[in-house]
């Protein structure tokens, strides 16, 4: 049974992508932190208009993050959900329905889930441009939060649950140790530099190229 907030999110994703998810995965309660509500990934297949996989969370926004100042008198939103956009050639199938389904794509979903759990675990507020170093070995060491600029409508990143309250939806991009190290070396300039690796802008901040898809 979905809560009203979760139903609004589900409907928001359906409206944005123009279709129902082909399947969903729920993070098992026995691996969740104590008192954290379950998180579900909705999987939307590539389409002609959006030729890439969309993995979208529902449940992270059940946690009300603490207030956070982000400068110039502004505060970060306090409820987030997350999406990961994946290259269409990655073979994504439901392992519950197909015993031959590959499972390597689940490593990307694990990064998505770890990001979705982070604010609750750390009792912190995370927002666009934040990086999370998960300290893991392998191709990726963590993630960065982006605005999913591949979508032309700004409404994609806000799911209104009432007239003045909304849930922010950030894109989760896996990052390598090399990228994270370069970002840290650049200090204050590293935040903008890292985001520009995925969405590149000109001097007027007009988007001129993008590489927004995760891959294995």
Q: Model-flagged regions — what are they?
A:
Residues 1-67, 73-78, 83-216:
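Acidic, proline/glycine-rich low-complexity IDRs
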């Amino acid at each position: 049974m979905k809560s009203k907030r979760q139903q609004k999110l589900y409907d928001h994703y359906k409206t944005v992508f123009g279709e129902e998810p082909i399947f969903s995965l729920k993070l098992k309660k026995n691996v969740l932190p104590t008192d954290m509500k379950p998180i579900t990934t909705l999987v939307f297949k590539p389409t002609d208009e959006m030729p890439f996989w969309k993995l979208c969370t529902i449940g992270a926004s059940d946690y009300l993050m603490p207030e956070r100042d982000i400068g110039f008198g502004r505060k970060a939103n306090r409820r987030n959900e997350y999406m990961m956009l994946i290259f269409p050639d990655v073979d994504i199938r439901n392992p519950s329905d197909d015993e031959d389904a590959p499972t390597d794509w689940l490593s990307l979903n694990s990064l998505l889930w770890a990001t979705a759990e982070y604010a609750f675990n750390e009792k912190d507020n995370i927002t666009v441009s934040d990086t999370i170093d998960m300290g893991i070995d392998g191709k990726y060491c963590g993630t960065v939060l982006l605005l999913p600029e591949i979508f032309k409508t700004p409404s994609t990143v806000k799911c209104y649950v009432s007239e003045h309250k909304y849930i922010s939806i950030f894109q989760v991009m896996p990052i390598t140790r090399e990228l994270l190290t370069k970002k840290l070396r650049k200090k204050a300039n590293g935040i903008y530099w890292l985001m520009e690796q995925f969405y590149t802008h000109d001097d007027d901040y007009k988007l001129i190229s993008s590489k927004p898809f995760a891959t294995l």
